[in-house]
Amino acid sequence: MSDTPQLVVHRDKELMAEAAAARLITKIVDAQASRGSASVVLTGGRNGNGLLAALAGSPARDAIDWSRLDLWWGDERFLPEGDPERNVTQAQQALLDSVPLDPKRVHAMAASDGPYGSDVEAAAAAYAQELATASVPENHAAVPSFDVLLLGVGPDTHVASLFPEHPGVRETERTVIGVHGSPKPPPIRISLTLPAIRAAREVWLLAAGEDKANAVAMALSGAGEIQAPAAGARGRARTLWLLDSAAASQLPRSLYPPASA
């Protein structure tokens, strides 16, 4: 497990999105070259969608073999199919509808009008099973070994739909949970848990804007994961925080080098 996070601080959110997109393209291409395919977990929110939009506008996107890319989601709002607030809907608009993905490798979480109806626990269990099925048998793992797992960081330090002091952040056994009573609307969601997040080779946390500065400082200054879920999001090989200068404004300069982009 990567215990020491790496920080890269960019001048503004636009540069952060462009740089993160370039990093992601390189990571996907390298994974496909070495293992034949790549697996990425997407995140919603303004920073996650900003990254996808930057990727869509990058000429280098054509270096990716989109037919050999598995896409998963870290969380989802449990709303009807096509709802504009669903993360998958926003991802489709930002990027997915413009690239030649294999539909069988786009692993969206169930909608509230899908096969499980309003039963969010059944929908979460089904996604956990889909993850387990996709895992390489010899790894004996409950989830695939994601190449990159993207996470936005909320102003309260939440990641995915794991909120401070909420039951979901305390989950240690299941890989996917139904979230009830989310402090951020809508109240019902589906989320990966911290154990599932930590199965990723690399976890990249994205934060931009002054409203994220306190959360970033708290997560990187020794807070516990129950109080600051972002502090518990770590990759097996690498944990990377991609920030703009506003989000990094409350961090001591000793935490990141002056040469940050």
From Swiss-Prot:
Biological-process GO terms, alphabetical: carbohydrate metabolic process; pentose-phosphate shunt
Keyword Hydrolase: yes
GO molecular function term, any single one: 6-phosphogluconolactonase activity
Key words, A-Z: Hydrolase
Pathway per the UniProt entry: Carbohydrate degradation; pentose phosphate pathway; D-ribulose 5-phosphate from D-glucose 6-phosphate (oxidative stage): step 2/3
Enzyme Commission number, as recorded: 3.1.1.31
Any Pfam family: Glucosamine_iso
Gene3D superfamilies according to UniProt: 3.40.50.1360
Catalytic function, reaction form: 6-phospho-D-glucono-1,5-lactone + H2O = 6-phospho-D-gluconate + H(+)
UniProt family annotation: Belongs to the glucosamine/galactosamine-6-phosphate isomerase family. 6-phosphogluconolactonase subfamily.
Protein name: 6-phosphogluconolactonase
